[in-house]
From Swiss-Prot:
Organism: Cupriavidus metallidurans (strain ATCC 43123 / DSM 2839 / NBRC 102507 / CH34)
PROSITE patterns listed in its UniProt record: G_ENGA
Organism taxonomic ancestry: Bacteria, Pseudomonadati, Pseudomonadota, Betaproteobacteria, Burkholderiales
Gene name in the database record: der
Protein name, as recorded: GTPase Der
Domain EngA-type G stretches: 3-167, 181-354
Function recorded in the entry: GTPase that plays an essential role in the late steps of ribosome biogenesis.
A GO term for molecular function: ribosome binding
Length: 447
């Protein structure tokens, strides 16, 4: 699971700039979702081989009781609840403000691990810039510049260390083993995630366990189908009530991101009786960016007539065209129709994501693709694609070597992707293609 870091502070201290630097983006991967306030943003970042989730909040005024300021305070409190570590950002140029004291008092009462970061500290002596802020009682502050990046890596590294100290299970990375393929069923509220979970587990003996901690922790449900073990990762807020699991349907961005990262295969569940929303597309985008294997389930199919079904299929092609690599299943979790086929696609998607491809076969497919259609010339030169090999799995990565590869167009990249997908039957997994230009060993030789 990925550690969660929340950025908290009064308005205009540089939280959004720090957020963008941590996610290496001007527009976070996880942007605003419809139904969530614009003042709580989620993004994914990575320091070395350490991935994490970061939450940017609006300017925080804990004592606000009405209007937009109160709503921003509510959103910030929720971010603190979801976080493993809180970075409390203050402004080194303006110095300590009364509002900083109020925020510090609030954060102390939450019991969260808090790191104090003094932003805009570039060109300033640490001792002088830090002196004002010791009275907050937050320990030694970190001096950083979110604009220039000074001190940011050290700050995030320390935050991740604290997160693992707080929850050691964050350091564990588990692949499909004795518990089988891990499946995350994700989607917006009320699309039928909990019904699908109960349909999948049926009347079998179920081992359900709540990982220790708060509501941000996932529930894992183990079951068997056809003699194969599987583990479901809950994102619907399932809680056991006797022998059944009841849903507390509350959409959580953190839970969704955590479960996608933890899963081997993601099932994106849509509601056939509702239009595909921007939120559906955002969730689909999370999955593709994460590189996870994917199966799409369109639920409540039994309630539609022929005309309505045609409209839904057209909507899928138009709004979720970027998911064309995934199998789509039209199911009814309530009536238990189409579930077996969906689960078979889960197995196929996992197999495709973990496939090992021999270099000679990859190179042969590349050569056949180039022979059928060469890349376009760029100026006087044409990209030369010479050989290819596999560069990784989950998702599969194919590395193409050659010369002048910066001239390969996006359209030609998609053409190659389709050729590789067809040749190796890579259905259900993203496929990434990387180009590496060969070095000319004689380029630097002297006559």
């Amino acid at each position: 699971m990925k550690p969660v870091i929340a950025l908290v502070g009064r308005p205009n201290v540089g939280k959004s700039t720090l957020f963008n630097r941590m996610t290496r983006s001007r527009d976070a991967l996880v942007a605003d979702l419809p139904g969530l306030t614009r003042d709580r943003h989620y993004g994914e970042g990575r320091i070395g081989d350490r991935p994490f989730i970061v939450i940017d909040t609006g300017g925080f005024e804990p004592v606000a009781k009405e209007g937009i300021v109160a709503e921003m305070a509510k959103q910030t409190r929720q971010a603190v609840v979801e976080a493993d570590v809180v970075i409390f950002l203050v402004d080194g140029r303006l110095g300590l403000a009364p509002q900083d004291r109020v925020i510090a008092d609030y954060l102390r009462k939450t019991g969260r691990r808090v790191m104090l970061a003094i932003n805009k500290a570039e060109g300033m002596k640490y001792t002088s810039v830090a002196a004002d802020f010791y009275e907050l009682g937050m320990g030694d502050p970190y001096a950083i510049s979110s604009t220039h990046g000074d001190g940011v890596r050290e700050l995030v590294d320390e935050a991740l260390d604290l997160a693992v100290q707080e929850r050691p299970e964050l350091a564990d990375q588990e692949d499909a083993g004795q518990h089988g393929v891990k499946i995350a069923i994700v989607g917006r509220p009320n699309v039928g995630k909990s019904t699908l979970v109960n349909t999948l587990i049926g009347e079998e003996r179920v081992i359900a366990f709540d990982m220790p901690g708060t509501t941000r922790d996932a529930i894992y449900v183990e079951f068997e189908r056809g003699g194969k073990p599987y583990t479901l990762i809950d994102t619907a807020g399932l809680r056991k009530r006797g022998k059944v699991f009841e849903a507390i349907e509350k959409f959580s961005v953190v839970k969704t991101l955590q479960s996608i990262a933890d899963a081997n295969v993601v099932v994106l569940l849509l509601d056939a009786q509702q239009d595909i929303s921007e939120q559906d597309a955002h969730i689909a985008g999370f999955i593709v960016e994460s590189g996870r294997a994917l199966v799409v389930g369109v639920n409540k199919w039994d309630g539609l007539d022929g005309h309505q079904r045609d409209r839904v299929k057209h909507d899928l092609e138009r709004k979720l065209q970027f998911l064309s690599f995934a199998n789509i299943h039209f199911v009814s979790a309530r009536e238990r129709t189409g579930i077996g086929a969906l689960l078979r696609s889960v197995d196929d998607a996992y197999a495709a994501a973990m496939i090992k491809l021999p270099t000679p076969q990859i190179t042969r497919v590349l050569q056949e693709a180039v022979e059928f259609q060469q890349p376009k010339r760029v100026g006087v030169s044409r990209p030369k694609l010479r050989y290819a090999h596999q560069g990784g799995s989950n998702p599969p990565i194919i590395v193409v070597h050659g010369n002048a590869l910066s001239g390969v167009t996006d359209a030609y990249r998609r053409y190659l992707e389709n050729r590789f997908r067809t040749a190796f039957k890579l259905k259900g997994t993203p496929l990434r293609i990387e180009f590496r230009t060969n070095k000319n060993p004689y380029a630097e030789s002297k006559d």
